[in-house]
């Protein structure tokens, strides 16, 4: 054993008062940094520590140099004594109990990691890299490697990080409070990556709360476990610069966008019924989407959530890809794989509300921190969830940073923002007296408006390749217009009116459709008021609504014919496209998150025909500029037949500057119509580029033999065409 150095005369007390020892042992001391660790008085230094189970403790420098033997002040593990140091520095202890010996690096001997500017920007709400500061990060600090933990809990009396590394003992790593920001932090030396942890919080009233998961955790345990996991920084080698450059430099409104909406846990499953990993999904889902011609995959929420039947919409970990499909690196590999073949990835993102699971954000520090305290603003009656407090800068910053995190760290191409209408209206799903008017007496949630505007400004300002899409079900104006023009700033908005009206029409027996012609024509009155996405989403095939094929009237042949005609009608209609998985091959059953899609149906001609049709629709839409370049501008659409309600026929022209127009003609009755006269913009031969009644799609094979002839009949250019039953055809001039 080394000979102890001569210790300087101590000019400060190295002992600890009985009250403070009691508080440390009880876990009620709010600032152990003031007591434990290394402290200086003049030229003298003392070290104090709390090491449960130790009978003897020796203090050392980080490189192992002896600096003093500490005296036991309490049998439960409190030690203190003078140490021989030239300056304040971190120390390590060698603890002994009987024959057992172990080393402990003192977390209280390290200085803070965060600085005053972090406090300032965090409090102001303008910190745009909180995800690099908050949560758990492996760093090297003052000569030691460990995990830096940081969490916002301004009203807590005490916050500790607990986990595998300290036996889940909240007395061991009590965090340092930063009064200027309300953030608690601690550097935990020698703690490795991969450990499970939570925060133990004593609320403002002194009551110990249930253990909380880390709001900024980048990885979580697999349900039913709920702890956060200290994750490494992503080390993905990205190979997608060409993909990102394309979307940075193009007007997304004038690009073909056809989105395949996917629930990652039920698209396909293993033979034993378990979920695929990200790498397994990549090997099958990516080539499938490439073959099908989709431009984007939109995932239902993949952020961590405890309850499978919530489909991810009740998330408890906004920064953590769910552990159901493996580690976060797997998701990064999946996105990279998509980008290498030109497929974009969109995340269904839920900033409107969060669940009240005890390990989540609810009453995080014993107060309504992330939510409103008044349930008239802070509780969502439809979903029994808490509503974010959009008037609090730290909460808005948490959400905006999360959007930036997904764009930067995972290279996501878009965010589909869920439940925007519930955010915009204070009286959403509330009766009279159950809501609080805004400062002007109205029902608009002005705080949510400002949040959404700020979100879009930040996203488009830092990641111009990303698009934001609003699921907004009302007529709120200018959802997809720029903020500087008074809009919310979204890139696109779901056209819920199109979905509702067209499905209402399609469910009707064809004999009655002539009485509801306006259900399909009305939508063109507002089709260009926003930049629309036409959604046939998961919402339309759950909760007893039946699948899309099951909604169609008639016998099986008519059901398939109706759906084929409807799909081509939609792909020819102005707006970007979205289709939920399984509907591309007309799955009969409603979607269930608990099992795979019914892929066995593809062995049957009608289902395989539907899949081939959707594939051809995608490639036709993408290859014909007239069908996509003016999706969001009225100049790209011209009615050809709008008022033939008697025959339930609709026809229009899709156009783009300098490009061949495409005529879209739909017959929504089972009547085979020959010699139907239609006006066209130019004489000559027009080629039938798509016919949903083709035999290859499962149809009857009726049509125009591939071409029609338009003739100039004294100023009016018309052609006589054959309209197959329950079918849509598309025509394009040959020259």
Swiss-Prot record:
The active site is at 418 (nucleophile), 471 (proton donor). Its EC number is 2.4.1.18. InterPro entries: A-amylase/branching_C (IPR006048), Branching_enzy (IPR037439), GlgB (IPR006407), GlgB_N (IPR054169), GlgB_N_E_set_prok (IPR044143), Glyco_hydro_13_cat_dom (IPR006047), Glyco_hydro_13_N (IPR004193), Glyco_hydro_b (IPR013780). It is an enzyme of class 2 (transferase). SUPFAM superfamilies: (Trans)glycosidases, E set domains, Glycosyl hydrolase domain. GO terms for cellular component: cytosol. GO terms for molecular function: 1,4-alpha-glucan branching enzyme activity; cation binding; hydrolase activity, hydrolyzing O-glycosyl compounds. It catalyses: Transfers a segment of a (1->4)-alpha-D-glucan chain to a primary hydroxy group in a similar glucan chain. Pfam families: Alpha-amylase (PF00128), Alpha-amylase_C (PF02806), CBM_48 (PF02922), GlgB_N (PF22019). GO terms for biological process: glycogen biosynthetic process. Gene3D superfamilies: Glycosidases (3.20.20.80), Golgi alpha-mannosidase II (2.60.40.1180), Immunoglobulins (2.60.40.10). Keywords: Carbohydrate metabolism, Glycogen biosynthesis, Glycogen metabolism, Glycosyltransferase, Transferase. Coiled coil: none annotated. The keyword Glycosyltransferase applies. Pathway: Glycan biosynthesis; glycogen biosynthesis. Catalyzes the formation of the alpha-1,6-glucosidic linkages in glycogen by scission of a 1,4-alpha-linked oligosaccharide from growing alpha-1,4-glucan chains and the subsequent attachment of the oligosaccharide to the alpha-1,6 position. Belongs to the glycosyl hydrolase 13 family. GlgB subfamily. PANTHER family: 1,4-ALPHA-GLUCAN-BRANCHING ENZYME. Monomer. This is 1,4-alpha-glucan branching enzyme GlgB 1. It comes from Rhizobium etli (strain ATCC 51251 / DSM 11541 / JCM 21823 / NBRC 15573 / CFN 42).
């Amino acid at each position: 054993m080394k000979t102890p150095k001569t210790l300087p005369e101590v000019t400060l007390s190295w002992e600890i008062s009985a009250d403070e020892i009691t508080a440390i042992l009880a876990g009620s001391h709010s600032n152990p940094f003031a007591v434990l660790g290394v402290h200086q008085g003049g030229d003298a230094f003392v070290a104090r520590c709390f090491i449960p189970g130790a009978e003897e403790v020796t203090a050392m420098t980080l490189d192992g140099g002896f600096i003093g033997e500490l005296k036991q002040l309490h049998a439960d593990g409190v030690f203190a004594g003078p140490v021989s140091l030239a300056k304040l520095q971190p120390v390590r202890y060698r603890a002994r109990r009987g024959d057992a010996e172990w080393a402990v690096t003192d977390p209280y001997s390290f200085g803070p990691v965060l600085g005053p500017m972090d406090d300032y920007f965090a409090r102001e709400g303008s910190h745009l890299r909180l995800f690099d500061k908050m949560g758990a990060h492996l760093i090297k600090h003052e000569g030691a490697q460990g995990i830096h933990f940081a969490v916002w809990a301004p009203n807590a009396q005490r916050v500790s990080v607990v986990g595998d590394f300290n036996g889940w003992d909240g007395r061991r790593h009590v965090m340092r409070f930063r009064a200027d920001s309300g953030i608690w932090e601690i550097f935990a030396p020698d703690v490795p990556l991969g450990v499970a942890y939570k925060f133990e919080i004593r609320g403002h009233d002194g009551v110990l709360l249930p253990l909380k998961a880390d709001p900024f955790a980048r990885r979580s345990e697999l349900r039913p476990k709920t702890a956060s996991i200290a994750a490494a920084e992503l080390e993905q080698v990205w190979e997608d610069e060409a993909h990102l450059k394309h979307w940075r430099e193009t007007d997304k409104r004038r690009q073909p966008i056809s989105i395949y909406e996917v629930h990652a846990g039920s698209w396909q499953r293993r033979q034993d019924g378990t979920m695929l990993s990200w790498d397994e999904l990549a090997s099958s889902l990516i080539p499938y989407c490439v073959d099908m011609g989709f431009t984007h995959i939109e995932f239902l929420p993949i952020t961590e959530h405890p309850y499978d039947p919530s489909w991810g919409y009740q998330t408890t970990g906004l920064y953590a890809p769910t552990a159901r499909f493996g580690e976060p690196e797997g998701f990064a590999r999946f996105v990279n794989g998509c980008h290498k073949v030109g497929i974009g990835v969109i995340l269904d993102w839920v900033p409107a509300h969060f669940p009240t699971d005890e390990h989540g954000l609810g009453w995080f520090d014993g107060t309504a921190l992330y939510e409103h305290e008044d349930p008239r603003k802070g509780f969502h009656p439809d979903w029994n969830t808490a509503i974010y407090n959009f008037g609090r800068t730290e909460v808005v910053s948490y959400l905006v940073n999360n959007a930036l995190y997904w764009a930067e760290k995972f290279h996501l191409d878009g965010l589909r923002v869920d439940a925007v209408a519930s955010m915009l209206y204070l009286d959403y799903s509330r009766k009279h007296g159950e809501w609080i008017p805004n400062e002007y007496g109205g029902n608009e949630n002005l705080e949510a408006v400002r949040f959404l505007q700020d979100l879009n400004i930040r996203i488009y300002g830092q990641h111009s390749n990303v698009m934001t899409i609003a699921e907004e079900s009302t007529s709120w104006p200018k959802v997809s217009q720029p903020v500087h023009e008074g809009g919310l700033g979204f890139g696109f908005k779901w056209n819920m009116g199109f979905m509702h009206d067209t499905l209402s029409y399609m469910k009707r027996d064809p004999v009655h459709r002539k009485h509801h012609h306006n259900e399909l024509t009305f939508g063109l009155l507002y089709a260009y008021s926003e930049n629309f996405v036409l959604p046939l989403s998961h919402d339309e095939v759950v909760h007893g609504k039946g699948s899309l094929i099951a909604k169609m009237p008639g016998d099986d042949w008519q059901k398939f014919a109706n759906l084929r005609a409807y799909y081509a009608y939609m792909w020819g209609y102005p707006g970007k496209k979205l289709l939920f998985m399984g509907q591309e091959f007309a799955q009969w059953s409603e979607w269930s998150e608990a099992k795979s899609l019914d892929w066995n149906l593809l062995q049957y001609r009608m289902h395989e025909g539907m899949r081939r049709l959707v594939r051809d629709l995608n490639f036709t839409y993408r290859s014909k500029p007239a069908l996509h370049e003016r999706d969001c501008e009225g100049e790209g659409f011209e009615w050809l037949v709008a008022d033939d309600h008697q025959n339930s026929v609709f026809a229009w022209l899709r156009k783009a500057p300098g490009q061949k127009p495409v005529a879209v003609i739909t017959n929504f009755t089972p009547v085979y119509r020959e010699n139907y006269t239609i006006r066209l913009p130019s004489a000559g031969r027009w080629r039938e580029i798509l016919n949903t009644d083709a035999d290859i799609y499962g149809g009857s094979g009726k049509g125009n033999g591939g071409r029609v002839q338009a003739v100039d009949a004294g100023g009016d250019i018309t052609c006589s065409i054959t309209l197959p039953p329950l079918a849509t055809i598309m025509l394009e001039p040959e020259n």
